Amino acid sequence: MNGMSTGTLVLLRHGESEWNALNLFTGWVDVHLTDKGIAEGKRAGELLLEHNLLPDVLYTSLLRRAISTANIALDTADRHWIPVIRDWRLNERHYGALQGRNKAQVKDKYGDEQFMLWRRSYDTPPPTIEPGSEYSQDTDPRYANLDEVPLTECLKDVVVRLIPYWEDTISADLLAGKTVLITAHGNSLRALVKHLDGISDEDIAGLNIPTGIPLRYDLDENLKPLNPGGTYLDPEAAAAGAAAVANQGGK
């Protein structure tokens, strides 16, 4: 770590989940990793080892796909023993009534423009999910202490819940010089990268984060990136993975 750098931040999107493979909107639905997703978690751990990027503390969401990916990666990197903090504010964006629906079918039914608004606009949430329905989380015990469980979210809602947690909690570990691993989701990580890199509400629509490839940020004492945009530990695979994410909704 150079003299100007504070902590090192590593962002990791969970490996491929069962619903990623089926091209379904997932959101807060708690699905398992596929075999490919498990392999991605292992590869992430190998990349951490190869780059001697050894986390001191782990933050994850409350969702199995992020927890499992982190466990596999840390076990592979021989860092399975580090402290772990899990928080709902790192959860994926809640996709409302779209949860459990096929992306290509939603696109066909509502058209490209509406599909992209729901999927990528900053402040247009999908329709709300019916409380008590199959893919709603309003009675899930892990959210019992929330005043209100979301019924839908746009990316702006994720920013509003996540950035105070970043500033109040995660930042302290980075300012103490720790290497912090955050294993989370496409949209919670997009919200954080938007904040770190000062990306506009419009331009964030074009940012896609691939599954299973660690993204390193070196931060100064104000937690501003010394390497804006971060550095993927496998840039070639990251570019291919981001392109695949951008194309979701295709047949």
Swiss-Prot record:
InterPro entries named among the record's database cross-references: His_Pase_superF_clade-1 (IPR013078), His_PPase_superfam (IPR029033), PG/BPGM_mutase_AS (IPR001345), Phosphogly_mut1 (IPR005952)
Pfam families given in the database record: His_Phos_1
Function in brief: Catalyzes the interconversion of 2-phosphoglycerate and 3-phosphoglycerate.
Enzyme active site: H14 (tele-phosphohistidine intermediate), E92 (proton donor/acceptor)
Gene Ontology MF: a single term: phosphoglycerate mutase activity
CDD domains listed in its UniProt record: HP_PGM_like
Top-rank lineage group of the source organism: Bacteria
Site (Transition state stabilizer): H185
Recorded metabolic or biological pathway in which this protein acts: Carbohydrate degradation; glycolysis; pyruvate from D-glyceraldehyde 3-phosphate: step 3/5
Primary gene name: gpmA
EC number: 5.4.2.11
Protein name: 2,3-bisphosphoglycerate-dependent phosphoglycerate mutase
Family: Belongs to the phosphoglycerate mutase family. BPG-dependent PGAM subfamily.
The reaction(s) this protein catalyses: (2R)-2-phosphoglycerate = (2R)-3-phosphoglycerate
